[in-house]
């Protein structure tokens, strides 16, 4: 029998933490509702694991030899995992420095969503633990400057184990661990080792970190204005791309039907966008092409060198903003746009018009032909670069029992769902609606689709007045006729349909499987069908580009393929060669 062998050696310049061969006792690997074996893979031995469904976090724990790994010199741990099963899954990797690690303290975690047959690395960054020199004074940030101490940090000199697990799986999943390495040279962050004293304020008048210089950093107003002149000279030397039409389509390529709007067509076995002039169009762009962005300054005044928001000339860049996560959750606070203030100081009082014109030249100089989501309306409506737009279900009440990173899922059976979409789409009339330069519309963003059971279970865990729950129960009544018939299948003991309505406890997923999957499909299809109807009412010739999936299960993907002209994903990786659509259909895809 083959075993796992733990070593610390150089593997192509990387520190191999685990090598799967015959020299180590497999009892070092602890299984939680899972089974494993070492077997031969394509390029050597692998650890083959299958996780069950009886534990909240089934998986394996791999202990360090001699009780610990000293990874002080490294930046991250990388685990290479192959999905050897038939279903896509999201797998988590946790690195612990203490037996008491609890998912928040004394550990760091990352994850990857892996399709069947796909191999992907999970990189877990070793956020350092030491004395918190900031004294907890940094808050309300999406990321921290190598934050030392506190939750989600470890002591890299004392790494004791690596965990691989899947959260609440509804079916068994199988995967292979091909390697576990430490990599990336750790370079101590300047802010916490240079002992800048005092550290506060640490943001300069341009909104930049002040305790370090780098190539391209703006050092003065004169420097800012000099960069304007140098860019103007550079852009003047760049010629327009040859062989393209005004939209950026391939004018010298094959010709197709010109409809006056963007559309899709399969050409030689591959999906393409066809531009309004009938030319092949490969969309390559970026999101957030806008003039300003804001950061909260309330409760953080001491962070900033210059409190520009108090100056009369910069009042147009002061706003009130509402955050949806972290410290400022559900608070409306004063915000300031350093980006806007910089543009005003760089281009003068006509900065909006000057910058809007410049953006299109800048995009073309970078080889880009599309303005993506969340971009400035003034820039888009200049009609010089193709763009996408977005509509939102906005204030639709959520399914109360649902869960998600960005929030709960909207109740698509609530009457306000369609009403809110129509209100959002009405704002596009005379703007992007009917505009040939607008490729189409996304809806919402990175929604909480969960697994194939989540939204159905969320409906059942909601109060009795939840519209989705009412629809689900009506469907069950039509199928089973009596509560007794439902109880027999689900293994439940509801005394009446009203008893089911009042209950907020989820049934056994295995026994209620067919009904849960069926209603999940109903929710997903209602979402995409309704959005499509609303878009086509106002912009019948423009494309529905989907909802920008970040996490998605096959049922939601299949529903999107049924109603979207193009299915969109937000794929947070550099390479999509191994990406596969899991919606059982041949549809055009776009990274949103």
Where are these regions (language model features)?
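Glycoside hydrolase catalytic-domain groove-lining segments
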Residues: 518-592
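Extracellular polysaccharide-targeting segments
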Residues: 149-150, 165-195
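Extracellular carbohydrate-recognition regions
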Residues: 13-33
